[in-house]
């Protein structure tokens, strides 16, 4: 074989590729066509195609076993056409054994490369082709899990996603595969987070952590601690979240497996995103922006499209909370382009909603309101609820700008009821603050009504350790009282809140607070 290959290279019938870690040889198109004709004439084409499919099935199976828990494998984009050809041939021949085993082995490759639409196609075909011998086995477990991931990211949070994850988890529990139990419980956590049901999501995060403890794998324990931290942030338990996330991210590897990408989900990236948001809420705006930027850099380095998309989305979220709309817009544009390129349909509406928020900030109230309505409709259709509270709050602010006060109050009240029901509490102080400001602007509303709601916002922010939202509520209270000449107490309260910050003094909120304090000699 070596001599034959060398002879073909010498005759320029084969090209050599030295760009990767392994030297690769490729027949020229004319040579390939000639060889295929000879193969067909010999009657051995079917035999060679079967060997080709089996060889890639075995290669992928071996690499998946070697990379188990490491989030990496050697086979990559340069071999994807071979894998596709093998799958096409296997299913065309109705060779159920080869087709389903190859699809199961290829699933991690499709997920690693974020070829989600393709992954969905092959997993659906393979599950339909499973016979009774493979139902309830490791093979079906892998196929169902990968089907759920590809469905969730391309089609939204349908019941079929929950069914696929649930079936895979049932098999993992039946065969005693703790690693897969951790990963599937983590994916069910993400599924419920995306639905906006944060209380049910938290239950699954705790279950994932319990399964990781049973594994005794330090990396999985750290990863699921990060998952719990992310959930605590969304539940408004920011101090606990900050501790969990900080501890989880201290783990850098060593004994056990890396807390990297499994079944298309990047534990570490998700924890860093959540840490950035939690840092902002707890009053560490400068650190939040730095961590968000680092998360985007890390995600770009992994070359994992779904992970980069999430990093861009949440880095933009941090910048939006910090009112740094210029830099946020740059991330949003990159996020939308990335989501389109990789068919991540449920994310596109989030990007459009964030662009609408920037339009509101720039004074384009009607355009912003119209786009937010479309974004919210699309998000609800895809059952992607993680940004509904924030967008509904912005919609209410836009309606207030247009003088549509009754609809603004109805919008914010409806969203607060939903958020309370499902535990979407991290933005509740901001929703209360915006409602208070709407009431303060609303003709015929007594000042004490607005003040009572703003006080609720302040007290809830305090209970959540959300210092940044506490500052906003204190500023709104001071402004409201200044309208009727009784702002002194609330200005002193604002000074007290301002004095607890140790960084972020250049942010718009902090500059506004400083100007208010300077105006009364308390700066």
How would you label these PLM feature ranges?
Residues 152-169, 173-426:
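Extended non-membrane alpha-helical scaffolds
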Residues 45-49, 72, 76-79, 92, ...:
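Inter-repeat boundary and helix-capping residues of tandem alpha-helical solenoids
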Residues 160, 410, 414-417, 421-523:
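C-terminal non-catalytic interaction modules
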Residues 1-42, 46-54, 92-107, 120, ...:
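C-terminal boundary/linker of central alpha/beta nucleotide-binding cores
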Residues 60-64, 111, 152, 193, ...:
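Specific register positions within alpha-helical solenoid repeats of the TPR/Sel1-like families, i.e.
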């Amino acid at each position: 074989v070596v001599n034959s290959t060398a002879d073909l290279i010498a005759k320029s019938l084969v090209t050599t590729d030295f760009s990767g870690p392994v030297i690769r040889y490729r027949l020229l198109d004319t040579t390939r066509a000639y060889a295929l004709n000879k193969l067909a004439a010999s009657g051995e084409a079917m035999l060679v195609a079967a060997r080709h499919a089996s060889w890639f099935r075995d290669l992928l199976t071996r690499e998946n076993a070697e990379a188990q828990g490491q989030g990496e494998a050697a086979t990559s984009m340069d071999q994807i056409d071979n894998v596709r050809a093998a799958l096409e041939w296997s299913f065309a021949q109705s060779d159920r054994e080869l087709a389903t085993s190859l699809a199961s082995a290829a699933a991690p490759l499709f997920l690693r490369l974020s070829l989600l639409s393709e992954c969905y196609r092959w997993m659906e075909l393979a599950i339909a082709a499973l016979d009774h011998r493979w139902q309830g086995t490791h093979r079906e477990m892998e196929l169902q899990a990968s089907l759920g991931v590809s469905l969730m990211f391309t089609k939204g949070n349908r019941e079929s996603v929950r069914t696929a994850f649930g079936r895979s988890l049932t098999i993992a529990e039946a065969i005693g595969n703790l690693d897969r139990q951790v990963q599937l419980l983590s994916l069910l956590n993400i599924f419920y987070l995306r639905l906006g049901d944060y209380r049910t999501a938290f239950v699954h995060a705790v279950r994932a952590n319990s399964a990781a403890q049973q594994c005794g794998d330090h990396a999985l324990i750290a990863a699921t601690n990060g998952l719990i931290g992310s959930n605590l942030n969304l539940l408004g338990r920011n101090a606990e979240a900050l501790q969990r996330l900080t501890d989880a991210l201290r783990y850098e590897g060593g004994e056990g497996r890396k807390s990297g990408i499994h079944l298309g989900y990047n534990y570490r990236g998700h924890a860093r995103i959540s840490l950035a948001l939690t840092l902002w809420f707890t009053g560490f705006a400068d650190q939040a922006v730095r961590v968000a930027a680092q998360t985007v850099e890390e995600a770009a380095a992994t070359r994992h499209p779904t992970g980069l998309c999430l990093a861009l989305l949440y880095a933009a979220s941090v910048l939006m909370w910090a009112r740094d709309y210029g830099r946020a817009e740059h991330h949003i544009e990159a996020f939308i382009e990335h989501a389109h390129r990789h068919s991540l349909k449920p994310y596109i509406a989030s990007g459009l909603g964030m662009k609408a928020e920037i339009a509101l900030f720039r004074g384009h109230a009607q355009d912003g309101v119209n786009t937010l309505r479309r974004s919210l409709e699309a998000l609800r259709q895809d059952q992607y609820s993680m940004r509904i509270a924030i967008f509904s709050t912005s919609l209410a602010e836009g309606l207030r700008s247009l003088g549509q006060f009754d609809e603004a109050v109805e919008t914010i009240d409806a969203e607060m009821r939903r958020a309370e029901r499902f535990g979407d509490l991290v933005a509740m102080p901001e929703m209360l603050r915006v409602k208070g400001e709407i009431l303060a602007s609303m003709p015929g509303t007594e000042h004490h009504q607005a003040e009572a709601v703003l006080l609720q916002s302040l007290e809830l922010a305090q209970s959540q350790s959300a210092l940044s939202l506490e500052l906003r509520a204190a500023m709104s209270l001071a402004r409201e009282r200044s309208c009727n000449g009784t702002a002194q107490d609330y200005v002193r309260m604002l000074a007290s809140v301002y004095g607890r910050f140790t960084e972020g003094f250049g942010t718009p909120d902090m500059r506004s607070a400083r100007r208010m304090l300077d105006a009364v000699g308390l700066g």
